[in-house]
Amino acid sequence: MSIRIELAESMEVLSLRVVGPYYEKIPQGFDEILSWAREHHLSIDKSLAFYWDDPSKVEADELRADVAITCKEMPSTLPEDVGIRREVIPGGLYAVTHTIVENGDFAKAWDDFYKAINAQGYCPAGDICYESYLCDGSNGKWDIEIWQSVEAAN
């Protein structure tokens, strides 16, 4: 797997927290946030999923993720009752890869990505890691970019 190291700018997103098995809760979260965005006539630029827990260390029903979108024009206010928040994702140094995920095997893509980061002389830094979806996966294949904040390994 090839990666690139990129100095990214901060990014404003609208996000919704989901808790539970990633394979189950992330699609449900996207259904909810995308439905909300359509109801509010928002023009979506990107769909992202931020992962806050390592599935090898946290029970599946306690896994936390944020599904998020970026919009051409962000709404000035957000309703308090739907759980959608405005957040700024910090800029900085990130490792990035572009890959195709088949048969729902996102774990393999992440494993390969982390091996490539280490092979390039970097290690994860901070907690920011996410997927940026370049298609809707309706054909069973997910065209994605994976992003991880990094620093040079010592």
Swiss-Prot record:
SUPFAM superfamilies in the record: Probable bacterial effector-binding domain
Bilayer-spanning residue ranges: none
SMART domains: AraC_E_bind
Main location: cytoplasm
Gene3D superfamilies: Regulatory factor, effector binding domain
Keyword Magnesium attached: no
Keyword Cytoplasm tagged: yes
Recorded superkingdom: Bacteria
UniProt xrefs under InterPro entries: AraC_E-bd, DNA_gyrase_inhibitor, DNA_gyrase_inhibitor_GyrI, GyrI-like, Reg_factor_effector_dom_sf
Alphabetical UniProt keywords: Cytoplasm, Stress response
UniProt subcellular location: Cytoplasm
Single annotated GO MF: DNA topoisomerase type II (double strand cut, ATP-hydrolyzing) inhibitor activity
GO cellular component: cytoplasm
Family, per entry: Belongs to the DNA gyrase inhibitor family.
Role this protein plays: Inhibits the supercoiling activity of DNA gyrase. Acts by inhibiting DNA gyrase at an early step, prior to (or at the step of) binding of DNA by the gyrase. It protects cells against toxins that target DNA gyrase, by inhibiting activity of these toxins and reducing the formation of lethal double-strand breaks in the cell.
Description of how the protein assembles with itself and partners: Interacts with DNA gyrase.
Name of the molecule in the record: DNA gyrase inhibitor
Organism: Pectobacterium carotovorum subsp. carotovorum (strain PC1)
